[in-house]
Structure formats: C-alpha cells, structure tokens
Curated annotation (Swiss-Prot):
The keyword Cytoplasm does not apply. One of its GO terms (cellular component) is extracellular region. Belongs to the tachykinin family. Expressed by the skin glands. It comes from Phlyctimantis maculatus (Red-legged running frog). This is Hylambatin. Tachykinins are active peptides which excite neurons, evoke behavioral responses, are potent vasodilators and secretagogues, and contract (directly or indirectly) many smooth muscles. One of its GO terms (biological process) is defense response. Coiled coil: none annotated.
Length: 12
C-alpha cells in the first residue's frame, strides 16, 4: 500500500 500523503509529503 502507498504511504499516507500527509506523512509522505511531510518527509519531503
């Protein structure tokens, strides 16, 4: 499953 958008973009 793909990572949560909030957590994924939060790491960027």
């Amino acid at each position: 499953d793909p990572p949560d958008p909030d957590r994924f973009y939060g790491m960027m």
